[in-house]
């Protein structure tokens, strides 16, 4: 074996010993690089005669081609080995049982809101909607809240650092009553000039915001307020609506209602509404579930209506609290933490 055959054998051995592309490139440099062994052979031809250069050059070029062929073959072998390793790592066992696709579900509070809308819808109530950033006027003034009322303070209400076009302060709505005001004013304007105004029956469900957070309060919570305005609407109608609603919502007739005198700036007289179950884990306990009352004449006037002619009642309840009562949940914050282990129980 001459020196060139020995060189080819050495290159083939080094290429075969390389187990990674980086090692193979290092081996290539030792034989085919600028300072490699083949390059050194070419440089050594300077002292040869023209005939010797011709013969020697042809032999060296043949040797270089054999080394390059060995290099290409090893590159392909390493690439194939890498591909096979990747395929093995990503192999899919088609005999394994399939994974069931996860099925989503409505949030329990969303279920409650839908249920509230369905029940009141069956009683002829419309559903109002409105902005979550409201003016101070719609949130407080229109509802007969005096300027010095504690609810207007930044300790209770989230104010936005800007005013509306009329210069009135803006805030995150602390209740959904502003939607009732907007609805009633639009209703009054739509039927202006008519001898008789069609009754206003509307509920206003949605998110509200207050500076409060504990096991039974959240800075963001849901509220549903209702309004029924007409010429002959009384507390008797309010009691009838509440009785039908709560018995339908909790799916039981074994339920009592109690109205306790209270105070709200926007109603007069006002009453808290309690319910008591005749059976079940809450049997015998009076539970506060809503506030209500006859709409204050000043509020009726702000609706754009004549309080001497039109009368009615308003009420407000917390869908979050109703959800807690319905499902036996003690901590309101669980509904808003996004823990699927908790929420998946309500599918």
UniProtKB/Swiss-Prot annotation:
Cited CDD domains: PheRS_alpha_core
EC number: 6.1.1.20
Note describing how the cofactor binds: Binds 2 magnesium ions per tetramer.
Domain of life: Bacteria
Cofactor(s) this protein cannot do without: Mg(2+)
Keyword annotations of the record: Aminoacyl-tRNA synthetase, ATP-binding, Cytoplasm, Ligase, Magnesium, Metal-binding, Nucleotide-binding, Protein biosynthesis
Catalytic activity: tRNA(Phe) + L-phenylalanine + ATP = L-phenylalanyl-tRNA(Phe) + AMP + diphosphate + H(+)
Matches recorded under Pfam families: Phe_tRNA-synt_N, tRNA-synt_2d
GO biological process, one term: phenylalanyl-tRNA aminoacylation
Binding site for Mg(2+): 268
Gene Ontology molecular function terms on file: ATP binding; magnesium ion binding; phenylalanine-tRNA ligase activity; tRNA binding
Subcellular compartments: Cytoplasm
GO CC terms: cytoplasm
SUPFAM superfamilies named among the record's database cross-references: Class II aaRS and biotin synthetases (SSF55681), tRNA-binding arm (SSF46589)
Family: Belongs to the class-II aminoacyl-tRNA synthetase family. Phe-tRNA synthetase alpha subunit type 1 subfamily.
Known partners and oligomeric status: Tetramer of two alpha and two beta subunits.
PANTHER family: PHENYLALANINE--TRNA LIGASE, MITOCHONDRIAL (PTHR11538:SF41), PHENYLALANYL-TRNA SYNTHETASE (PTHR11538)
Protein's name in the database: Phenylalanine--tRNA ligase alpha subunit
Organism: Leptothrix cholodnii (strain ATCC 51168 / LMG 8142 / SP-6)
